[in-house]
Amino acid sequence: MDKTLSREEAKQLMQLLCLDMSCWGNLPLMRRQYLVKCKEYHPDKGGNEESMKLLNSLYLKLQDSVSSVHDLNEEEDNIWQSSQIPTYGTPDWDEWWSQFNTYWEEELRCNESMPSSPKRSAPEEEPSCSQATPPKKKHAFDASLEFPKELLEFVSHAVFSNKCITCFVVHTTREKGEVLYKKLLQKYQCSFISKHAFYNTVLIFFLTPHKHRVSAINNFCKGHCTVSFLFCKGVNNPYGLYSRMCRQPFNLCEENIPGGLKENEFNPEDLFGEPKEPSLSWNQIANFALEFDIDDVYYLLGSYIRFATKPEECEKCSKNDDATHKRVHVQNHENAVLLQESKSQKNACTQAIDRVIAERRYNCLTLTRKKLLTKRFKKLFNEMDKIVVGERKILLYMASIAWYTGLNKKIDELVVRFLKLIVDNKPKHRYWLFKGPINSGKTTLATALLNLCGGKALNINIPSEKLPFELGVALDQYMVVFEDVKGQIGIEKQLPSGNGVNNLDNLRDYLDGCVEVNLEKKHVNKRSQIFPPGIVTMNEYCIPETVAVRFEKTVMFTIKRNLRESLEKTPQLLSQRILHSGIAMLLLLIWYRPVSDFDEEIQSNVVYWKEVLDNYIGLTEFATMQMNVTNGKNILEKWFE
């Protein structure tokens, strides 16, 4: 700054800026004051024009001078760069060195000559009086450089940890140790605290009645150690650390409890903090959702919170009708109470649903379709143990079998052929078309098959721009049903028109199953997979050839008056949704097909249910049911009068 303005000019500028000379060189401050004074001295603001001109000239001169000084310094700094200096010992370096010393040759030359010292006569040999150099004294050990190595096995080495503990050790200077000993005892109401000397430093060991983070203790101690060194550690083995600090090279200075810390005198709560309160187990909720294959957040939440009721006060448990419910209720009661009081109920259930979806996707990618179908049948058998109980229920399900037999005389062969189609999943041989007039039984049979195999029903009569998210429902599903697809032209004019057939024509890759297609859901990334096989149901619409060739089989339905009349007189089949259930279709296979047609894993279940059905109804009684269906009567007229 001395090279920028003269002394007089500098004083004059600082006076105009109304700053003391001690602020000379504080360029940011001078800049702010310059802007303030410009407004004050400006003629338009009523200021002095001469003062304004002088201020501008001096300040601009200062700026130019400062920039020129900086440029000069940069040039001086960049005269020689390390990249320009050759390697030492090479001819290039010798040449560079001679050039570098050219400018200094005259200034550093010395022409003086030293007079030669007079020659001394050779002294006579005298006994040597020299002695060995005494050994250097060892420097005193500085214990402030690192935490004592003797204690490392007892403390935590975590750098960043949110874990809360109750036992700590602090390493600092002797002076700060005196202060911190009292401050820590007062601040945290320590249940035990002791001070130990270690060379020229101090270690403070203490136990707190409540849990704290190591960072919280460290920050408190730092407030009293702005210059002095400080190490703060969490202790994993409290008694081991204390006993080690009572032996050399450590010395016990003082402690708040006479006699010190004894191994058996402290409860676990004193050493490791208050006992941990039971917390909500998200994993237990996920296991419950996996066991019952629940993929609905709100249904899972509602079902699980029911377990918060005490098992002895639960109606289902007291009836002893469902052993599974009682077992699950007892296992999940305590966790359900915690869920009921939790503020993250939905988050816990959402994670459980994610586990169910993840398990389903894993099975789809690793198990064969035959294994998946067998697993589905096992689930239905478990449901049958709870639902198909007692004579009345069994007769209702047998009535549904009689009704399906009236729909198609070879209904069992039709179902077996469809299951083979679904399991094989051959490209271009993966879909059946159920076609017929209104109220002919298409949707009833399609829904029963869907519930037998597991899957979703899709509506593709929507606009094409909404179709991707509707198709995304088929992610990880075993099969699908395109329900009630509408076309543009129908055999009967009263049929409404729709986009279904047109959309179906644009989904050839989905129907063929030759290539993977992209499926997407909201808030889920797109995923490529072979679209699942299934069924298409529609009324009597005209189908383009490009769509018709993609159906492996077309099943034509006709209106049968006796079927409608028998259903009207046996309303339980519809009101209890027995006809649409997968259990009814599985019992149909058990009734008609031999045991050998089933997978070996479930043949024992098939044998059991064949015996159950034979105990409640024989061939004569079943023939009576079929006759009632044919005549349009109440199917269970003989039993339920």
Swiss-Prot record:
ATP binds at residues 436-443. The keyword Zinc-finger applies. Residues 410-572 form the SF3 helicase domain. One of its GO terms (molecular function) is zinc ion binding. It catalyses: Couples ATP hydrolysis with the unwinding of duplex DNA by translocating in the 3'-5' direction; ATP + H2O = ADP + phosphate + H(+). Residues 12-80 form the J domain. The modification Phosphothreonine is found at residue 133. The modification N-acetylmethionine is found at residue 1. Its cofactor is Mg(2+). A motif (LXCXE motif) lies at residues 108-112. A zinc finger (T-ag D1-type) spans 277-369. Forms homohexamers in the presence of ATP. Interacts with host HDAC1. Interacts (via LXCXE domain) with host RB1; the interaction induces the aberrant dissociation of RB1-E2F1 complex thereby disrupting RB1's activity. Interacts (via LXCXE domain) with host pRB-related proteins RBL1 and RBL2. Interacts (via C-terminus) with host TOP1 and POLA1 allowing DNA replication. Interacts with host TP53, inhibiting TP53 binding to DNA. Interacts with host preinitiation complex components TBP, TFIIA and TFIID to regulate transcription initiation. Isoform large T antigen is a key early protein essential for both driving viral replication and inducing cellular transformation. Plays a role in viral genome replication by driving entry of quiescent cells into the cell cycle and by autoregulating the synthesis of viral early mRNA. Displays highly oncogenic activities by corrupting the host cellular checkpoint mechanisms that guard cell division and the transcription, replication, and repair of DNA. Participates in the modulation of cellular gene expression preceeding viral DNA replication. This is Large T antigen. It comes from KI polyomavirus (isolate Stockholm 60). The lineage of its organism: Viruses, Monodnaviria, Shotokuvirae, Cossaviricota, Papovaviricetes.
